[in-house]
């Protein structure tokens, strides 16, 4: 007989490791599982130097958070351990974050953290401790499939859904992960935290980017990849120089404010060319793209990705976490994966994720996704756009 986590055996004989960040979500997850009778162990990861971030409001995984996680564990009566993952986090997340900006991309470090640190290394640690599952406080859900595997679905609370940041979870990882808050709203989570008398019940939610102590991500990039802060030209779609900038890392595709160019119409950042250190600007209409090329595909839907991509498939995609899924068609074009958006999308930037869903609303199933390398329009293949723009997008 399966317990509430879809595992064999009673809760009392089921060990679960909970990733405790010190926030209300993971703390409530631990308290809920403990109340249900599971053998719960709390683990908090020390991911970076907490000196400057310890007292910054909204920081995640900072020094105070470690103390909060320890206090919660003591309150609910579970063992709690702090693991030093700073070197792993720097290599897997911070270094890649800085390098991505240096290449003119807009990275999403939370995805890499979930994939490479929390769900890979921490899951291994949980299994070494004899745990049958690793539980987190993410707002996403999973469902048991007829063959015993797990399917990831969007959270019941659409405003809190974090599936965009979890698309890179592998099928093997997903089979061992549990998300107890996936069918709850944030309000329900806080109410549970109050009911459990948790000291973090009213704590503010964490904000990205956790490892930027000052809140200025360019400080990290300037220190680690100074070439990304070298000056260059701001040009229009025809290549005409309109002005100058102090580093491409200060810009992202879709940006309007802070360009520093006076023009008769609003100008937006349309592309970044790291090789020439050019920031390419244009009207808003130039932001809309309907063809996206992807790398590093992760597929967690039915069947294999090779079969799906070879035959082509209609699905729904997100290119930003705050946007609703848009209808699109997935296919292979030669040796690379393409997604064609039926209605197009604005501000598609290399480095961001393109996440696949099987439905546009509700608790849609997450099918996987990939990272964006290029965004264009079908007409670009005919050479109708400025060469520098085509090379950069």
UniProtKB/Swiss-Prot annotation:
A Pfam short name: tRNA_Me_trans_M
EC category name: transferase
Keyword Kinase: no
Intrachain disulfide bonds: 113-210
UniProt name for this protein: tRNA-specific 2-thiouridylase MnmA
GO MF assignments: ATP binding; tRNA binding; tRNA-uridine 2-sulfurtransferase activity
Region of interest: Interaction with tRNA: 160-162
